[in-house]
């Protein structure tokens, strides 16, 4: 009932216009005033500037593929007072490799207000605060195609410090309890098994399978797990019911990637927070002061039969 109350005003607007053009509206999204809703009449995406992330992606009027922490709807946090990770859900950027910063993520990048500009062609330009901890800031340009469901993210990391920084752009997307996730199995790279298994993160019995050139991972209710992959095919996907979300990026041969060469990563979270993370990572770059690097990723949503795998 809450979702209908939130969206009733915008659904009427959709019926009054032709499909095939992207519009951007300011809405109240579960208590966050002034959220940005992009739609082309088929798909829609919502960016919440107060917490710096995409919080909704799906078909117009349909289910949200992204996981949201309903206990935190409408809430914000003060980065100066934040000592632990506040897990709002949705999609955001971190720097990688994680082993260089441990835990929690810098609240300047994860949970702080981001500046948003609507560009003339209905793209969103999103700018994070400066991360003093990492010496960087992120700038994202988010483009929804004029028709269909494809979203393109131009994710740029800028060195705002006075010395070299060496990082990868890491896009972390939390998916609402999918039935299964998958990525290509690739045995000709750095992982003879076809995937990389993170230390102390092996899947529960029966949760990981390999068939037809793919690695499939399901969520366990009691145990977290994480795998990575270095397939040059460069895609990763999740399916829930008859909805399939595929995320992709171009693999760059010969470049250094985090986590034993992983460009693709899947993390499964146990109950009570029922989500899986699909993660795309760019090459590790050494940036001089003022230099920047960009990593382009794409999302595509489609309807499939429950027996279809791709």
Protein language model regions, located:
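Bacterial N-terminal signal peptides
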Residues: 5-16
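Short, Gly/Pro- and small/polar-rich lid/capping loops
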Residues: 19-36
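Extended, loop-rich substrate-binding clefts of extracytoplasmic carbohydrate-active enzymes
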Residues: 23-25, 95-149, 166-167, 178-180, ...
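A contiguous, surface-exposed recognition patch within enzymatic or periplasmic domains that forms
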Residues: 36, 43-45, 50-57, 64-66, ...
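Short, hydrophobic/aromatic-enriched beta-strand segments in well-ordered soluble domains
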Residues: 42, 128, 291-303
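Solvent-exposed N-terminal domain segments of exported/luminal and surface proteins
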Residues: 43-44, 49-106
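Beta-strand elements of well-folded, non-transmembrane domains
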Residues: 130-132, 144-146, 157-161, 282-286, ...
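Hydrophobic core residues within well-ordered beta-strands of beta-rich domains
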Residues: 138, 151-153, 293
């Amino acid at each position: 009932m809450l979702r209908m109350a939130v969206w009733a005003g915008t659904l009427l607007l959709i019926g009054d216009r032709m499909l095939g053009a992207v519009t951007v509206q300011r809405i109240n999204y579960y208590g966050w005033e002034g959220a940005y809703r992009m739609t082309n009449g088929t798909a829609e995406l919502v960016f919440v500037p107060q917490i710096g992330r995409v919080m909704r992606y799906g078909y117009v009027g349909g289910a949200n593929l992204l996981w949201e922490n309903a206990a935190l709807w409408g809430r914000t946090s003060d980065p100066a007072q934040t000592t632990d990770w506040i897990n709002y859900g949705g999609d955001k950027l971190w720097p990688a490799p994680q082993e260089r910063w441990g835990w929690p993520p810098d609240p300047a990048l994860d949970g702080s207000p981001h500046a948003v500009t609507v560009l003339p062609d209905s793209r969103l330009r999103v700018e994070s605060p400066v991360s003093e901890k990492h010496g960087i800031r992120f700038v994202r340009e988010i483009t929804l195609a004029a028709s269909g469901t494809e979203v393109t993210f131009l994710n740029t990391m800028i060195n705002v410090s006075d010395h070299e920084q060496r990082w990868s752009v890491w896009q972390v997307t939390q998916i609402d309890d999918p039935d299964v996730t998958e990525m290509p199995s690739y045995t000709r790279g750095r992982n003879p098994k076809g995937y990389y298994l993170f230390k102390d993160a092996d899947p529960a019995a029966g949760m990981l399978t390999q068939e037809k050139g793919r690695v499939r991972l399901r969520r366990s209710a009691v145990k977290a797990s994480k795998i990575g992959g270095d397939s040059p095919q460069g895609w990763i996907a999740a399916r829930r019911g008859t909805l399939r979300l595929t995320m992709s990026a171009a693999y760059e041969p010969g470049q250094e990637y985090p986590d034993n060469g992983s460009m693709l990563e899947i993390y499964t979270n146990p109950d009570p927070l029922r989500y899986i993370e699909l993660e795309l990572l760019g090459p590790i770059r050494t940036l001089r002061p003022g230099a920047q690097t960009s990593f382009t990723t794409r999302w595509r949503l489609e309807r499939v039969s429950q027996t279809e795998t791709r």
